[in-house]
Amino acid sequence: MNEILLFLLSLAGAFVLRVCGFGFGVFTMAWLPYLLPSYGEATTLSGILAMAGSILVAFKNWRKIDWYKLTPILITFIVSSCASIHFVSVADDHLLKRILGVMLIIASLWFLAISKHVKVKPTLPVQITMGTISGVMGGLFAMHGPAAVLYFLACAKDKDEYVVLTMTYLLLGNIMMLGFRIHNGFLTPAVGHAFLYGIFAVAIGTWVGSKVFHRLSTDVVKKISYAYIAISGVLSLVMS
């Protein structure tokens, strides 16, 4: 395993997560499947590191959480992610990498083009739909943020509430998925070894990202996020 590359990936992923409110898995999963023995172990590592990156923000601002906006989509996510995690344990790694690449590109095109013209209202059907998509993408690719972001952007009253909603959603979702991944045998010594290198990078990236977050407008944050989603998708397809 290339420990230096792992450190840099974790650093950049944590930075993006803190600035954008999502994206750790989107960024790191373009590379982690090639650094870990199996795809399932890669998703496990990505989920644990993302959980570490979101825990401080979620706990620090827990009083600002509007649970009415969070609970329905979170419950739907939990249900839909279970089957997806089981699928990872029996699916071909190369197939999953190709699917991941396509999903990343589709997600980036959605955010760059369609989301400018389609307004998402924070209704129960929207929460169920976004929660289902988020669960599938989280279980398969450790990137359950993009689908949920559309919902949180629509219902959050400001940038600060948006970030605390997404961070709490990612934290609780990753805790749940970690249990299922342990059950499927994806928490291995290789994951533990990689975590020791990644956790320090996550701490640094989160700290730097918190400084940048307060200086950027929401529009700039969105554009940066959409661009790297597309790049990650292309890289995943090329390297699969």
Describe each region flagged by the PLM.
Residues 3, 7-71, 135, 143-202:
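Small-residue-rich hydrophobic segments that form or flank transmembrane alpha-helices
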Residues 3, 47, 101-104, 108, ...:
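Residues within membrane-spanning alpha-helices of integral membrane proteins
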Residues 86-88, 137-144, 177-180, 231-240:
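Hydrophobic alpha-helical transmembrane segments in multi-pass integral membrane proteins
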